[in-house]
Amino acid sequence: MKIRSVGAVVAAMMLAGAATACGSSSSAGGDGPQIAIVSKGFQHEFWQAVKKGAEQEADKEGASITFEGPASESDVEDQIDMLTNAITRKPDAIGFAALDSKAAAPLLEQAKSEDIPVIAFDSGVDSDIPLTTAATDNKAAAAEAAKHMADLIGGKGKVALVVHDQTSLSGIDRRDGFIDWMKQNAPGIQLLPVQYGGGDQAKSADITKSIIQANPDIKGIYGSNEGSAIGVVKGVQESGKKGITVVGFDSGQAQIDAINSGVEAGAITQNPIKIGEEVVKAAMQAIDGKGDDLPKTIDTGFYWYDKSNIDDPKIQAVLYH
């Protein structure tokens, strides 16, 4: 374990402040191993749930964590700055959810050269440097969303996708998993060109309204993460168009409310608390010199939920508010 000087701690605090100026951050824990977690976001309820899981596990393990993420899930440069600052603080391990699967590669090389183990989460990277990736099987989850969409609209009609990005592996997999299932299993469904809203609710709502205006006969719209799905719901509501089936991804209070009210048909929920827990568990294993024993991926699971099962205790346990 690394020994820190007073000067290093002061420098770390200053750097953390600089990162906070363009996003949000928090810290928790005591004097144990230091784990710096750089997320894809901070404000969405999903990321707050990941943070909660990481904090809970850090308390169990006697570790100390910092958790930060950019204000928007399109702020790749801000996230790179945060990762740079995290490496400068020389933590015992880093948890990283990449907004761009390629942009962080040089920094991951730097972390490796400084013997800082990296644990990827939510989105992997185009690198073998992370010892493991704790994440949902996003392709399988998106395929499940596609299956439910096809069933809900009777296997025919136009369907649109509003995806959070085309640079992170989660964005790519949630797009491709949905499209591939539809192409293989639903020949009667016409997929419209994919639109990208950056996970931003307002932008995704505007995109949705444009889709509806250009395709008044549209049957369904899929939103690939919390911000995208809520944006789709708002866009459908603001358009005044009835009869559009909305399928989302993630949960959060706004999506839960939309499903309970019938505006959204259903969604895939991940297990963000478990993701946070697994990041810290894996980091601690790496700090203890057992990183080579970690599996390549840690599948944290997913569930379909709708009005019929939303009150099931198993579903309630993985919904975040």
PLM regions with names:
Residues 46-63, 141-145, 169-189, 203, ...:
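Short, solvent-exposed amphipathic alpha-helices that sit
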Residues 79, 134-159, 173, 201-205, ...:
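Hydrophobic alpha-helical segments within soluble ligand-binding/sensing domains
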Residues 34-57, 61, 66-81, 97-101, ...:
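Extracytoplasmic "Venus flytrap"
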Residues 59-72, 158-161, 183-201:
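Short beta-strand elements in bilobed, periplasmic/extracellular small-molecule ligand-binding domains
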Residues 1-34, 59, 109-116, 321:
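Short, low-complexity disordered leader/linker segments with a strong preference
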Residues 101-140, 148-151, 158, 252-260, ...:
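Flexible loop/hinge segments that line or gate small-molecule binding clefts
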